[in-house]
Amino acid sequence: MSKVTELKMRLKRGEVYRRSDLLQWSNAVDRHVVMLVKDGTLQKLATGLYYYPNVSVFGDTPPEEAALVRSFLKDDYFLVTSPNDYNSLGVGTTQLYNKRVVYNHKRHGEFKLGGKTYTFMAKHRFPKKVTPEFLLVDLVNNLDKVAEDHEFVLKNVSTRLKTMDLKKLMRALKEYGSSRAKSLLTPLLQKLEVNHAN
């Protein structure tokens, strides 16, 4: 059995591999990877990042986004979101963006992975999953990056605050808010808290 065939037998469908992951099974990893990409076994996603595709009735399926980002970062702690998620808040954002944002601790910048562009943002703190409270704080953090009128969005944010869980919102603001977001939202939240207490 050839070394390439031996390497091929160790691969699992649907998995994303770094070049370094394949070193344990190959004595000539670069040559073997080139051969596997050439014969269609592996797909090159980015420099040093490869995918062994699952096959469906429609052909090869793309890698799962979480597996792709996890392999790229070599880390499990990240949050993938999109400016499109702001539209779910009902605060007047309606634009659709072809952009994915990855909050993480390791990388910063734009990277093309598997044909999609991801904006990696190195942040000290971010939640494990997206919540409406985090989204609202994140929207105010990134207000300068949305296409809609900022005053209009902020007016709608102040209205939306009234329907949200104040404790969760204050915690999200404290943990994830920029100084600008804190200066804009803290007075509104304090006013709501006083009104809620009365």
Can you name each region flagged by the protein language model?
Residues 1-4, 30, 62, 66, ...:
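Alpha-helix initiation and N-capping motif
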Residues 123-198:
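Hydrophobic alpha-helical interaction segments
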